[in-house]
Amino acid sequence: MITIEQLLDILKKDHNFREVLDADGYHYHYQGLSFERLSYDSRQVDGKTLFFAKGATFKADYLKEAITNGLQLYISEVDYELGIPVVLVTDIKKAMSLIAMAFYGNPQEKLKLLAFTGTKGKTTAAYFAYHMLKESYKPAMFSTMNTTLDGKTFFKSQLTTPESLDLFAMMAECVTNGMTHLIMEVSSQAYLVDRVYGLTFDVGVFLNISPDHIGPIEHPTFEDYFYHKRLLMENSRAVVINSGMDHFSFLADQVADQEHVFYGPLSDNQITTSQAFSFEAKGQLAGHYDIQLIGHFNQENAMAAGLACLRLGASLADIQKGIAKTRVPGRMEVLTMTNHAKVFVDYAHNGDSLEKLLSVVEEHQTGKLMLILGAPGNKGESRRADFGRVIHQHPNLTVILTADDPNFEDPEDISKEIASHIARPVEIISDREQAIQKAMSLCQGAKDAVIIAGKGADAYQIVKGQQVAYAGDLAIAKHYL
């Protein structure tokens, strides 16, 4: 429960309070109301709900519906003049985060918090950390792929970083379940829209940076994207940073006065020898490591997670066992066809991660290589040119472009846009299952491979704003082995 006096105090301390308006006019103080629930969904309110009117598409009609269900007061940046009191604020999203934090009893203070950011590798690194910490502790995890609040049951995540009301409710459940640590992926969007406003992480990890999520409804420029990524560093007590990433010198200057550790080529923490399923490291993680996920970049993700977990109480033995146990749904899943050709299923969904994926496969498969790829609709439009550029640099690839969450766009138009950046013919088969089936039918021997990129373990396609049932790349590939 939270009282009106408590929430006004929170807003005033954050300099985010304008006034309370009701039929009697302006009020700096207000009393007599308390709330047992928080919501930003007008369909889920009653007389004991504190409602947040948020979003560019919010309509007064939503508020009218809530009032008919008993709503007594709402928080907003706008007075909709509907006859009930409104707490006016300058920034509704910041208000949501701080009020949710207090409402749920500040659960962040009862957990050790580890956050990963980066253009790629967040989910893989989070899974590595989860398995490392699980050896001696009770970690919860919020990832793009799956979320677990008790370490036993997992459910599909809706957002990389949950909305603040959901985030703190889930954190509180983690505390109730006796969890000791929480591992999170923190996206640039989470900072852009203040989902983690006011939250300080025990350790923040910056894996890498390359252009992505740049478009009309995301970040307008790379500078804006990079800036919002860096906010994790400002909001972490200690940081772990990849010294091999672009703009590392800038980041090193930024964190000079913080507790920090670097890994990679310009640091003391490096991978010294690398095999397909093992590596050796020097520095704080000196030793031999077995790993199920192939690719040097996955070994670097393991290093990043290991250095972070070392700061959070994990032993070197915990880290070695955790790395050896880690598998990630939809990340570098490898199947073998009856004719011994390989099928790689991976979530690679931007130019940089696609380049990494192709390089790993080409290292091991030297025959005919088939690539199945699409790009999502109505987001990240810059990826389409990036995909074309990467494909153009791999002339040995036979490419079939297909649907990948087309949303409100025509998947064929998206494929044509990607194709316009490739200086050789490619095939377009918008039905994703048909594209996979055809590619697999063209592989004939152990040196051949099909690479199915983009959706990973997602068992749906986003079409016209809805999740439409889709068997999933892995399930379809298994069917045609």
Swiss-Prot record:
It catalyses: UDP-N-acetyl-alpha-D-muramoyl-L-alanyl-D-glutamate + L-lysine + ATP = UDP-N-acetyl-alpha-D-muramoyl-L-alanyl-gamma-D-glutamyl-L-lysine + ADP + phosphate + H(+). ATP binds at G118, T119, K120, G121, K122, T123, T124. A motif (L-lysine recognition motif) lies at residues 404-407. The modification N6-carboxylysine is found at K229. Pathway: Cell wall biogenesis; peptidoglycan biosynthesis. One of its GO terms (cellular component) is cytoplasm. Disulfide bonds: none annotated. InterPro entries: Mur-like_cat_sf, Mur_ligase_C, Mur_ligase_C_dom_sf, Mur_ligase_cen, MurE/MurF_N, UDP-N-AcMur-Glu-dNH2Pim_ligase. It is an enzyme of class 6 (ligase). Its EC number is 6.3.2.7. The keyword Cell division applies. GO terms for molecular function: ATP binding; magnesium ion binding; UDP-N-acetylmuramoyl-L-alanyl-D-glutamate-L-lysine ligase activity. It is found in: Cytoplasm. Keywords: ATP-binding, Cell cycle, Cell division, Cell shape, Cell wall biogenesis/degradation, Cytoplasm, Ligase, Nucleotide-binding, Peptidoglycan synthesis. UDP-N-acetyl-alpha-D-muramoyl-L-alanyl-D-glutamate binds at S42, Q158, T160, T161, S187, R195. Belongs to the MurCDEF family. MurE subfamily. This is UDP-N-acetylmuramoyl-L-alanyl-D-glutamate--L-lysine ligase. The lineage of its organism: Bacteria, Bacillati, Bacillota, Bacilli, Lactobacillales.
